[in-house]
């Protein structure tokens, strides 16, 4: 496989010009985007379709496109960045940081706590999080999101990262009144209102599966993770504090059901969520701006409407 000379691969879904509606698959550089399908017609123009390719040379094709200086770069200011993927399954892990479990006064789980969201919850960078009229207790949760790149069933922890295409930033927005009190405290109902799963801005490709150079390697289980609300830091931790690391989560889930390319996994949030704060809990209101940041993966910014 050809080696990249540019560092990490960051793939985005974008609309190239204001007024257009068709989404495109691109490679994100510092201040520009390369349209992958325009440069190589064999590359699908959709993230999930691309990840579903069985071809072993799909990463080489992307690397070749990015390395070719003759390929047109589109200034990022001329593009609208969308959610990087329209996922298959949206799987979520609850209480996966010890400090978060402690602040919630819940027992440290012995196995991953699993719930889900529906695809109506997905939105992208700079999209508005819509505060539903049915909830007065909407909360934030910065999370690292795993993107599956290869069908996984009964995989071992030692092999699990080979099934991970990459990672992105997510916000597991939660209506605490529905999650914890209303209608028998159903987590699903509290987690899957429209726009309650912002993700982005890009999928940072797992260097192991793309055979990138050693200097691009990063450990997804040891990244700083932070959330700011209106400029004030409300969550600040590291994925080193995972109770169940990414290998454990992927392996565990694959033994329960098949993971397919394009499935995504929210891996849990650190301490600092709004509803637990004493004496004054914090809930999102119209006009708030939330910034979720993860080392190596970038920043995801959304406003509340």
UniProtKB/Swiss-Prot annotation:
UniProt keyword list: Calcium, Hydrolase, Magnesium, Metal-binding
Cofactor: Ca(2+); Mg(2+)
SUPFAM superfamilies in UniProt: FAH
Name of the top EC class for this enzyme: hydrolase
Name of a matching Pfam family: FAA_hydrolase
Annotated residues for binding of a divalent metal cation: 141, 143, 172
Enzyme Commission number(s) from the entry: 3.-.-.-
GO BP annotation list: small molecule metabolic process
One Gene Ontology molecular-function label: hydrolase activity
Family: Belongs to the FAH family.
PANTHER family referenced in this protein's UniProt entry, alphabetically: FUMARYLACETOACETATE HYDROLASE DOMAIN-CONTAINING PROTEIN 2A (PTHR42796:SF4), FUMARYLACETOACETATE HYDROLASE DOMAIN-CONTAINING PROTEIN 2A-RELATED (PTHR42796)
Record function comment: May have hydrolase activity.
Identification of the protein by name: Fumarylacetoacetate hydrolase domain-containing protein 2 homolog
Organism of derivation: Dictyostelium discoideum
């Amino acid at each position: 496989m050809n080696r990249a000379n540019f560092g990490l691969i960051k793939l985005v879904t974008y609309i190239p010009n204001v007024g257009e509606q068709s989404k495109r698959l691109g490679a994100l550089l510092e201040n520009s985007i390369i349209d992958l399908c325009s440069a190589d017609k064999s590359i699908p123009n959709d993230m999930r379709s691309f990840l579903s390719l069985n071809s072993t040379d799909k990463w080489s094709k992307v690397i070749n496109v990015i390395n070719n200086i003759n390929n047109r770069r589109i200034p990022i200011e001329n593009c609208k960045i969308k959610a990087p993927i329209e996922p298959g399954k949206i799987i979520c892990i609850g209480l996966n940081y010890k400090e978060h479990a402690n602040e919630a006064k819940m027992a440290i789980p012995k196995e991953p706590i699993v719930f889900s969201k529906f695809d109506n919850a997905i939105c992208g960078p700079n999209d508005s999080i819509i505060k539903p009229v049915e909830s007065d207790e909407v909360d934030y949760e910065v999370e690292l999101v795993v993107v599956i790149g290869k069908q996984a069933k009964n995989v071992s922890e030692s092999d699990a990262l080979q099934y991970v295409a990459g990672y992105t930033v997510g916000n597991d927005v939660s209506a605490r009144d529905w999650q914890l009190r209303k209608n028998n405290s159903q987590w699903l109902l509290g987690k899957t209102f429209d726009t309650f799963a912002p993700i982005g801005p890009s999928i940072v490709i797992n260097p192991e599966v793309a055979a990138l150079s050693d200097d691009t390697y990063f450990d997804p289980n040891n990244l700083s993770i932070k959330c700011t609300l209106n400029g004030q830091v409300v969550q600040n931790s590291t994925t080193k504090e995972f109770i169940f690391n990414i290998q454990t989560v992927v392996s565990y889930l694959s033994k329960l059901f098949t993971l397919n390319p394009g499935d995504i996994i929210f891996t849990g949030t650190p301490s600092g969520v709004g509803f637990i704060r004493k004496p004054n809990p914090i809930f999102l209101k119209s006009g708030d701006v939330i910034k979720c940041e993860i080392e190596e993966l970038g920043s995801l910014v959304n406003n509340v409407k």
